[in-house]
């Protein structure tokens, strides 16, 4: 499994690894990632999974390390199933695998998984050398290599936080791409919100560590410090207990949130190269699965116990495992 660059690529890869290790020997599973993926390694449930961490900050040494470390793996294993989950790191590794197939008569199978409505730059290249491309969103005209499996997320039986439901609970999550503009949106809403209701509202705010001090001061200038919880990463989110969520529309976030609740306003990360978050959002707006405007509610707004999203299948991971292990 290869993934890097962002949580949107890495988290589906880790979900796949955790499920695969339940039916296959984890000693035979290798996860290749970069320094961003290294932050998520604690989510791997088996301690026996092999890992290669490649530092991608210096591109020359990055490519050199890929060639040296990955070539050794291909030389000592002539029949490997590879799955690229996105990020620049996947392309050179999958290309090397293909070259081994051509020139050294290896029997490697190459697959890719695309989390977004449109292919990212790496997967646009990877598609041409892949045996199959597993896609997350349904579409009318599927290409010959494409197989719809949906998106999938981490273990749904994880420990989750317990919120004080005497408060109106608000969550802001910006993903690994950052949440600065979302925080500015939230600050603007708080500044214009009725101060009486603010006392009954609790905010759970994701802030990049590099901006924590500055943004924390902006929040505490507006409201009592006891009404805030600040975090950079939070693994125990109980999404269905929030009265409103302000979130990026990255593929991982959008699917997991909508599985639990539709009390969400998605805001795309517009500086992304291909605007994939905008296309993700457009898909769900078309299906009336995102609020049209962001506002802080003045009363409890929890989803109905009968809430069900027919487009989100948390068990789609079983389908991709069937295809890649048969």
What are these model-derived regions, one by one?
Residues 18-21, 32, 36-45, 164-244, ...:
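Donor-nucleotide binding loops and adjacent catalytic segments primarily
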Residues 1-7, 22-65, 149, 174, ...:
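Conserved nucleotide-sugar phosphate-binding/catalytic loop shared by glycosyltransferases and other
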Residues 247, 263-274:
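Short hydrophobic beta-strand element within catalytic cores of glycosyltransferases
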Residues 37-39, 81-102:
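An aromatic- and histidine-rich active-site surface loop
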Residues 310-326:
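C-terminal alpha-helical cap of glycosyltransferases
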Residues 239-253, 263:
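Acidic donor-binding loop of glycosyltransferase active sites
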Residues 56-81, 91, 99:
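An amphipathic, basic-hydrophobic alpha-helix
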Residues 100-159, 286:
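Active-site-proximal region of nucleotide-activated glycan assembly enzymes
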């Amino acid at each position: 499994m290869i993934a890097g660059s962002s949580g949107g690529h890495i988290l589906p890869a880790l979900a796949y690894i955790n499920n695969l290790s339940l039916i296959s020997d984890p000693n035979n599973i290798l996860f290749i990632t970069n320094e961003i993926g290294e932050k998520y390694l604690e989510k791997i449930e088996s301690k026996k999974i092999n890992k290669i961490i490649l530092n991608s900050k210096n591109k020359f040494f990055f490519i050199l390390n890929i060639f040296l470390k990955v070539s050794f793996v291909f030389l000592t294993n002539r029949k490997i199933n590879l799955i690229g989950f996105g990020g620049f790191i996947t392309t050179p590794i999958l290309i090397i695998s293909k070259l081994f197939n051509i020139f050294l008569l290896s029997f490697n199978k190459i697959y890719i998984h695309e989390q977004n409505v449109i292919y990212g730059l790496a997967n646009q290249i990877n598609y041409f050398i892949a045996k199959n491309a597993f896609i997350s969103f349904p579409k009318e005209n599927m290409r010959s290599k494409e197989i719809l499996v949906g998106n999938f997320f981490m273990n749904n039986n994880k420990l989750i936080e317990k919120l004080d439901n005497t408060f109106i609970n608000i969550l802001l999550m910006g993903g690994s791409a950052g949440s600065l503009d979302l925080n500015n949106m939230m600050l603007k809403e708080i500044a214009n919100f009725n101060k009486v209701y603010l006392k009954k509202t609790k905010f759970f705010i994701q802030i990049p560590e590099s901006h924590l001090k500055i943004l924390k001061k902006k929040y505490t200038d507006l409201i009592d410090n006891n009404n805030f919880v600040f975090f950079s990463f939070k693994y125990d989110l109980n999404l269905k207990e929030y009265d409103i969520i302000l979130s990026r529309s990255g593929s991982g976030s959008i699917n997991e949130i909508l599985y639990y609740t539709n009390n969400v306003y998605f805001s795309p990360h517009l500086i992304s190269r291909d605007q994939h978050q905008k296309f993700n959002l457009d898909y769900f707006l078309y299906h009336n699965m995102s609020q049209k405007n962001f506002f802080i509610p003045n009363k409890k707004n929890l989803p109905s116990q009968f809430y069900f999203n027919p487009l989100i299948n948390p068990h789609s991971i079983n389908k991709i495992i069937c295809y890649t292990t048969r």
